[in-house]
Swiss-Prot record:
Transmembrane segments: none annotated. This is Uncharacterized protein C17D1.01. GO terms for cellular component: cytosol; nucleus. Residues 159-188 have a biased composition (Basic and acidic residues). It comes from Schizosaccharomyces pombe (strain 972 / ATCC 24843). Residues 151-188, 222-243, 399-418, 433-584 are annotated as: Disordered. Residues 399-409, 433-453, 483-500, 511-531, 572-584 have a biased composition (Polar residues). The lineage of its organism: Eukaryota, Fungi, Dikarya, Ascomycota, Taphrinomycotina.
Amino acid sequence: MKAVYLDYLLRIRYTYVFNLKVSYQSERRTYGATEHFVGCLVPKAWNCLADDYTDIKTLLDLLFGVTAVIIFACTFKCFTMTEDGLTKLNLEAFLGVSGNTQELLESLGISAIPDLSNLGASNNNNSGLTFDPNDPSAAAFYIAQQVAAIEHPPPRKMTSSEKTRSENRERKKRWREQNEERNKDNDLRCRVNKKAKKLFGSEPSIEKTNWIEAEFTRRHTKRKEKERACLSQNQSSNASRANSQSLLPDLDLLATNSSANAVLQGSAINNALNALAKDPNLIHSLLTQIDFDPSKSKDGLNLGSLTDVVPPQPPQPEHELAALQEHNEAHDAAMRQYELERQQNAMLPGLASIDGLQALPHLDFSDSAVTNQSHSQSQNSLHPLISQSETHSIFSALSETPTPVSGNGNVADAPPDFSLSQVMPLDLIAPSMQPSAVSSPMSESHVQISSEMPRTGMSALPMRPRSQNVDKHRKFPYYNKRNAVTTPSSPYDGAQSGSPQFPPFELPPHNYSQAQSPNLATPSPSFSSLPDVSLPPIVKPNLMSEPTPTNSDEKSHALGFPPPPGQKIEFQRSSSKNGTAKSD
């Protein structure tokens, strides 16, 4: 049987069995067999092997004999731990009524009692036992004490270094509690110095020092105010809780006992007012506790019970209600009128003088259908004025003065000195006009209101043509005034000079929204302020032939003026010998 159990244990738990046997044999020579086995090895075997009692008993029987089995059984089955940590034996329940040791052995499956004299008679100083080895109860009590010492070991004596560290830890804890404000100030100053180093650099300066002190004072004051606010809030909450507890009985007395005498009611009111005066936040806390449902029972403080104490407010007079209603209606009407005027001004800017739009102020622009209809009417009323014949022109239709009507009912033409700017700015009329529908007393070649603007977005006015007789005194800035013979007077004077011609300069844009340019193809009568001048033909320059520069050109170039376009002049310092040398 032993061989079978040994083979089983070696195959299943070979590692732990080997370690346990080696540790037992090594420790037995030093401390003694029984004491060390009970104190150290038995808990290891119980916790690490298995829950099956048979395996543990067999292992102990194979390794140490029957004595170990008895000690093991007495240790883990014969005692219980109490609350105070002391060991109390329960041998009576385990051994039976007679208390015979033979019953213990029979229950453990042991047929003979081993010789325990060696356990108590050992002369080993390290394993001195204080119990009788022949008494199983004494042996079990001793084993229980050893197990209790293992589970609850006595405090270990600290070394000098451990004691010093523990004392320092406690001392620092007390110092932090006593110097809490000082630590906060030091931490705040470190943060301020770090911020100042980023702003002013690491070098000391007066500005840096002043900023550090001001910032530290500001942050310190802010922290103190925050701490005071938190402290007052905590105190007020505690006071509110205490005062509410003392105020509720008085209010409940006033609400439930309406027939109480005046003395009782007066004392309750005084107590309630005193409590409210001590804590302003008490009303808010009371509102959270009051039940405003009058349908509930009057078992506590509710709205139904307070109606007996606080009388209802009298209703407002009828004339005051009527005046308030009239005021509200007048205010609403004024707001509607203001919105109507604002929408009219936003939709129809500058067209209030047109006859077709006189009825628009009587419309309600809050309706989208009315808005669309009025806008279409304004456009329709404007287009017939533009598309009329020459006898009924746009100038007479837009005039502020009464338009004269002839005998046959037709509208007379406008006077010759009529100005469009007197009626309306051109920017407001030009987007609505069609180029083909514009008719005026004057020629269409000189007044063309066209929607086809240049791609650059710049408008150009009709430019007066340059005349040789008028512009004879004018010179371009890059010509010398003393070269009047060889210098052309204008870019249009191409017949008298071989210099290249230039297109007319564009004038800067003006405040007119449409371009007006003279029609050069068909001569027609023009405005009175613009004389009818015929333009000479523009001669294209011959790019293949280079003009020969003269001495005057060299002189003007030497004086700092640039040469005429198309000419490149190079001269030498010794002009006496090589004065006529020209560069190709």
